[in-house]
Amino acid sequence: MNLQRRKFVRLDSTGVDGKLKSVRGRLKKVYGKMKTLENWRKTVLLACVVALAIDPLFLFIPLIDSQRFCFTFDKTLVAVVCVIRTFIDTFYVIHIIYYLITETIAPRSQASLRGEIVVHSKATLKTRLLFHFIVDIISVLPIPQVVVLTLIPLSASLVSERILKWIILSQYVPRIIRMYPLYKEVTRAFGTVAESKRVGAALNFFLYMLHSYVCGAFWYLSSIERKSTCWRAACARTSDCNLTVTDLLCKRAGSDNIRFLNTSCPLIDPAQITNSTDFDFGMYIDALKSGVLEVKPKDFPRKFVYCFWWGLRNISALGQNLETSNSAGEIFFAIIICVSGLLLFAVLIGNVQKYLQSSTTRVDEMEEKKRDTEKWMSYREIPEYLKERIRRFEDYKWRRTKGTEEEALLRSLPKDLRLETKRYLFLKLLKKVPLLQAMDDQLLDALCARLKTVHYTEKSYIVREGEPVEDMLFIMRGNLISTTTYGGRTGFFNSVDLIAGDSCGDLLTWALYSLSSQFPISSRTVQALTEVEGFVISADDLKFVATQYRRLHSKQLQHMFRFYSLQWQTWAACFIQAAWKRHCRRKLSKALREEEGKLHNTLQNDDSGGNKLNLGAAIYA
């Protein structure tokens, strides 16, 4: 019997594991539609930021009815805010479920730089899961929705502004804390959340605006709370006042309350208060005088913008314009505004300065390099036309690279990463070169590993006729002209325009057939007509590739090299022209011989003396 029970339990456990694995498999299919796990975490991080902006909207729900002197609620705002918050919390609950399944059932952790999931130990999982799971549960509990949806329709009692404020605050802190692990995971994989300096500066500016908006929302609710405190204090000073908490609700307010409340709390500026019985509203007097507490629900944008402006103004001014009463809560709120404004302003300025300095630092380095170059050229007494060419090259190189030393950066990488990076940079460009289209990927990879990026300014000479050819250039962008006077005769001249996809410096034939270590002599002069960017391979590297990869010696590749070689094209054109001229000369000489033969035959066949005399006379004439 015990064996059967054990067997039954074992089978049941297997079934549970199978169901869990099935659920995990379905979740993997859903998340498989995302490019990588990091993209999903970025999306969740964005949802958390949106949630931080939604929660303070609960503080705008209470209103004051200026006609009946009672409290009411913006029911439209209640519905909208509850729906949005529930949707975002549901989205985050999906993330929690996926996280728990992948981390507890099949222990996994943050993704690697390529999006691959890395397995962690159980001890690491316990330390990471406990705190974050508790924070996640607290942050997604629908406490504000329950409060505003259950108490408002019943109207059994007034929803205390203080309770609502502390509910939002108690969940706002966990919502901020839960963003930290997501932020660390995203920055660990991407290096930074912001992919550009402008986005980073905008993100810091958004956080500054968010804090201003949150302070404005708390100021709004505290103003209503202060108004309620004034009414209750006035009632406490009057012997015949019978106001209760429920009497302040609009559904229970009566005419007696209206007459009493109309004169109980006059709005007096703190500086003009002379009577000790007058209630001091402190820094909330602006909200009461402006009417934002008494506006209709359809005027919510006006209320929102005014409170946001109040928060932004006082955060930026560090609370210097705030005139508080002797209320401890009000003074503490003013202190928070002052300190947080100082910290946020310092963080904002520091981050913006960091993003700006990352670009201006290189500009300063470039300017310093220009000054050093000018000093060197003056010291060496470089001619003015050479100075202009040097300046033009430095400016062009800066525009293309922004001060990044590409070759030094590639050399600092590990070998496998360097080869993979070069393959990504050069392989597609190499395949666009007609000369290299017949090569397989292994040959192209060998060439990619030895290519270097080069830049040329206008009128720069790449190679001159009669000089040794040390590099072979593949053109990425720009126009060049290739000329030669080497044609086997005096006065010969040939020119060819080179564009993107062409190459110059015919080293392939030399690398394939020549046994000499001396570089070949260029038969052409190549000059840049515009700014040119390309990549080169040295003669030694090309010789090494030709030696190691014997497939370059195939007849098909050799014919293709000759077909695209400018030197072979020039020779072929010269041979064709010479053959055509020989053909024309032979044809002309043949025609002349035929005419001479006809004339000779005509003279021999004419036996008449008169004709001979007449012919001689005609010739004499």
Swiss-Prot record:
Residue spans crossing the bilayer: 44-64, 77-97, 129-149, 163-183, 199-219, 330-350
InterPro entries recorded: cNMP-bd_dom (IPR000595), cNMP-bd_dom_sf (IPR018490), Ion_trans_dom (IPR005821), RmlC-like_jellyroll (IPR014710)
Annotated Gene Ontology cellular component terms: plasma membrane
Binding site for a nucleoside 3',5'-cyclic phosphate: 435-556
Record note on domains: The binding of calmodulin to the C-terminus might interfere with cyclic nucleotide binding and thus channel activation.
Subunit-structure text: Homotetramer or heterotetramer.
Name recorded for this polypeptide: Cyclic nucleotide-gated ion channel 11
Organism of provenance: Arabidopsis thaliana
Gene name in the database record: CNGC11
